[in-house]
Amino acid sequence: MTQTSYVLNYWNIPGRGESIRVILALGGIKFENNFVPLPLPLENPENQSPPPFDDGTWGKLKPHTPWGTLPTILLPSGETIGQQRAILRYLGKLIKHEGNYLYPEDPETSARVDGF
Protein backbone atom coordinates (compact mmCIF):
# COMPACT_ATOMS: atom_id res chain seq x y z
CA MET A 1 0.00 0.00 0.00
CA THR A 2 1.33 3.43 -0.92
CA GLN A 3 0.90 6.42 1.37
CA THR A 4 0.46 9.98 0.19
CA SER A 5 3.09 11.74 2.29
CA TYR A 6 6.32 11.19 4.15
CA VAL A 7 6.41 10.19 7.83
CA LEU A 8 9.35 11.45 9.90
CA ASN A 9 10.00 9.40 13.04
CA TYR A 10 12.09 11.13 15.69
CA TRP A 11 12.18 11.83 19.40
CA ASN A 12 9.91 14.53 20.77
CA ILE A 13 12.83 17.02 20.68
CA PRO A 14 14.34 19.09 17.81
CA GLY A 15 17.79 17.38 17.59
CA ARG A 16 18.69 15.56 14.37
CA GLY A 17 15.12 15.64 13.14
CA GLU A 18 15.02 19.43 12.89
CA SER A 19 17.27 19.73 9.82
CA ILE A 20 15.08 17.15 8.06
CA ARG A 21 11.94 19.10 8.96
CA VAL A 22 13.52 22.30 7.58
CA ILE A 23 14.44 20.66 4.26
CA LEU A 24 10.97 19.12 3.89
CA ALA A 25 9.38 22.52 4.59
CA LEU A 26 11.76 24.28 2.17
CA GLY A 27 10.76 21.81 -0.53
CA GLY A 28 7.07 22.19 0.23
CA ILE A 29 6.82 18.44 0.85
CA LYS A 30 3.89 17.23 2.92
CA PHE A 31 4.99 15.13 5.87
CA GLU A 32 3.74 13.81 9.16
CA ASN A 33 5.77 14.19 12.35
CA ASN A 34 5.67 11.00 14.38
CA PHE A 35 7.11 12.16 17.69
CA VAL A 36 8.51 9.22 19.66
CA PRO A 37 8.68 9.69 23.46
CA LEU A 38 12.27 9.74 24.71
CA PRO A 39 13.13 6.47 26.46
CA LEU A 40 14.25 8.17 29.66
CA PRO A 41 14.01 6.47 33.04
CA LEU A 42 10.75 7.07 34.85
CA GLU A 43 10.44 7.46 38.60
CA ASN A 44 11.25 4.19 40.34
CA PRO A 45 9.89 4.44 43.90
CA GLU A 46 9.71 0.64 44.26
CA ASN A 47 13.33 0.14 43.14
CA GLN A 48 12.37 -2.17 40.29
CA SER A 49 15.28 -3.75 38.48
CA PRO A 50 15.73 -2.73 35.75
CA PRO A 51 14.08 0.64 36.38
CA PRO A 52 10.99 1.39 34.29
CA PHE A 53 11.53 3.38 31.12
CA ASP A 54 9.30 5.14 28.58
CA ASP A 55 5.80 4.11 27.56
CA GLY A 56 7.13 1.33 25.33
CA THR A 57 6.79 3.19 22.02
CA TRP A 58 10.51 3.07 21.21
CA GLY A 59 10.81 -0.59 22.15
CA LYS A 60 8.07 -1.43 19.66
CA LEU A 61 9.41 0.84 16.91
CA LYS A 62 13.14 0.04 17.20
CA PRO A 63 13.07 -3.43 15.56
CA HIS A 64 11.36 -1.90 12.52
CA THR A 65 14.03 0.75 11.91
CA PRO A 66 16.86 0.07 9.44
CA TRP A 67 19.65 0.56 12.01
CA GLY A 68 17.86 0.52 15.36
CA THR A 69 18.14 4.31 15.58
CA LEU A 70 16.21 7.48 14.86
CA PRO A 71 15.55 9.52 12.78
CA THR A 72 13.87 7.50 10.07
CA ILE A 73 11.65 8.62 7.25
CA LEU A 74 8.95 6.51 5.69
CA LEU A 75 8.68 7.29 1.99
CA PRO A 76 5.41 7.34 0.04
CA SER A 77 6.60 4.10 -1.63
CA GLY A 78 6.63 2.36 1.76
CA GLU A 79 10.44 2.22 1.92
CA THR A 80 12.13 3.44 5.13
CA ILE A 81 15.41 5.35 5.18
CA GLY A 82 17.42 5.63 8.39
CA GLN A 83 20.21 7.97 9.50
CA GLN A 84 20.03 11.75 9.34
CA ARG A 85 22.67 12.27 6.66
CA ALA A 86 21.22 9.61 4.36
CA ILE A 87 17.79 11.20 4.70
CA LEU A 88 19.19 14.69 4.01
CA ARG A 89 21.08 13.45 0.93
CA TYR A 90 17.96 11.73 -0.37
CA LEU A 91 15.86 14.86 0.10
CA GLY A 92 18.63 17.06 -1.33
CA LYS A 93 18.53 15.04 -4.54
CA LEU A 94 14.75 15.49 -4.72
CA ILE A 95 14.29 19.13 -3.75
CA LYS A 96 15.27 22.16 -5.81
CA HIS A 97 15.85 25.65 -4.43
CA GLU A 98 16.29 28.54 -6.85
CA GLY A 99 16.50 26.04 -9.71
CA ASN A 100 19.25 23.87 -8.20
CA TYR A 101 19.03 20.61 -6.31
CA LEU A 102 20.05 21.04 -2.69
CA TYR A 103 22.54 18.16 -2.93
CA PRO A 104 25.03 18.67 -5.77
CA GLU A 105 26.10 15.97 -8.24
CA ASP A 106 29.70 17.18 -8.47
CA PRO A 107 31.86 15.03 -6.12
CA GLU A 108 33.96 17.94 -4.81
CA THR A 109 30.96 20.15 -4.12
CA SER A 110 29.00 17.30 -2.56
CA ALA A 111 31.98 16.56 -0.29
CA ARG A 112 31.86 20.17 0.92
CA VAL A 113 28.12 19.82 1.56
CA ASP A 114 28.76 16.60 3.51
CA GLY A 115 31.31 18.49 5.61
CA PHE A 116 28.64 20.71 7.11
Predicted regions and their residues:
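GST-like domain detector, emphasizing the conserved glutathione-binding G-site
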Residues: 2-116
